[in-house]
Amino acid sequence: MARPVVAIIGRPNVGKSTLVNRLCRSREAIVHDQPGVTRDRTYQDGYWGDREFKVVDTGGLVFDDDSEFLPEIREQASLALAEASVALVIVDGQQGLTAADESIAEWLRTQNCKTLLAVNKCESPEQGLGMAAEFWRLGLGEPHPISAIHGAGTAELLDQVLTFLPPKDEESDEEEPIQLSIIGRPNVGKSSLLNSICGETRAIVSPIRGTTRDTIDTRIERENRRWRLIDTAGIRRRRSVNYGPEFFGINRSFKAIERSDVCVLVIDALDGVTEQDQRLAGRIEEDGRACVVVVNKWDAVEKDSHTMTAMEKELRAKLYFLDWAPMLFTSALTGQRVDSIFALAALAVEQHRRRVSTSVVNEVLKEALSWRSPPTTRGGRQGRLYYGTQVASRPPSFTLFVNEPKLFGDTYRRYVERQIREGLGFDGTPVKLFWRGKQQRDAEKELVRQQNRQG
């Protein structure tokens, strides 16, 4: 079975996300002094002793508010409880017992999940005992005083959490999942796409821009592989965002790109490529991530048999940073071609991790040189490309040894990259070329050593 799940439940602004960051030793959950900052359920890896588990952070539960998101937040919490070994219920010791806490306790009794009660914001043991006493009235068992921000009482709380987890021998070793992030501007359909992929309401979907404010992690199996899907807050130009939860969510989205194996860049078919889409494309290429471009809302486009070809040409002209990325036209609403995302992403990841022998690299370079010689300067100096070798993967990176790097202009460098792609593939991944000066005799000796090392 997969690692056990611990669900974090409570009303808004009692410190759930702060506790998640404490339990998972991270800063991934957005923490801000505004109620309701976390709206979707988000997953992180938790560790205590020799045990590993998943911590799922849910949106703040409220039962006396008419916000349009509240039914969805309660549904997210129910889904989290359905997969959890224990629900860690968080209350605010400084504010004391509230009617909202009592409503949550009553609702929890209708759910089939064991509970553990933590009284947060107890900054000293003496203070904590007094604050915790009144929470016995909730009927959720012994209240445990803690301070999520300072760590007081959290060790004892985690010891209690472990007693609710299944025995360790019931867990199996898992291959590390492929990290796939869903990236795009607000309201291009990222959360709808995630829900279509998963077949459940995994992220709250609304026509209001910026509905998703955290990065949301989901584990799923497709194409005989395990995936960790990351739906991110919509990324806008920084000057249009005020400091607050949305600002922190945007920064989290950029971090999601950094920790991804492959990014799915979602473009709105009705809007086309915007300046912000171009910035995102550049960020993905700059960070060296594999990528699939998904053009969503294809069902809403009036089209004939030529529309897709014409639109792809137009989009690619503007997304020149990602001319190597496959492009897929989808509809999250109807599910059209959504399943194909995984096939393309799996291929992109495979190419992103691929390594090629030095002999094969140099066969391709020899062919490239036979078709087009390096440029010659006005003074009669000609560039000479001695040999190349792959020095890294993720992304594939090559060092090309030449007589003098400055003799090779951008045009010829792009030509060599195109020839490497045509000869070796690497669809769906950026390729990095490093041009290094070397004396011919030294280059020839180094090439022999490289070939002997690879057998």
Curated annotation (Swiss-Prot):
Pfam families: KH_dom-like, MMR_HSR1. PROSITE patterns: G_ENGA. The gene is der. It comes from the Bacteria. Associates with the 50S ribosomal subunit. Gene3D superfamilies: 3.30.300.20, P-loop containing nucleotide triphosphate hydrolases. GO terms for biological process: ribosome biogenesis. GO terms for molecular function: GTP binding; ribosome binding. PANTHER family: GTPASE DER. GTP 1 binds at residues 10-17, 57-61, 120-123. Keywords: GTP-binding, Nucleotide-binding, Repeat, Ribosome biogenesis. Residues 354-439 form the KH-like domain. GTPase that plays an essential role in the late steps of ribosome biogenesis. Residues 4-169, 178-353 form the EngA-type G domain. GTP 2 binds at residues 184-191, 231-235, 296-299. InterPro entries: G_ENGA (IPR031166), GTP-bd (IPR006073), GTPase_Der (IPR016484), KH_dom-like (IPR032859), KH_dom-like_a/b (IPR015946), P-loop_NTPase (IPR027417), Small_GTP-bd (IPR005225). This is GTPase Der. Belongs to the TRAFAC class TrmE-Era-EngA-EngB-Septin-like GTPase superfamily. EngA (Der) GTPase family.
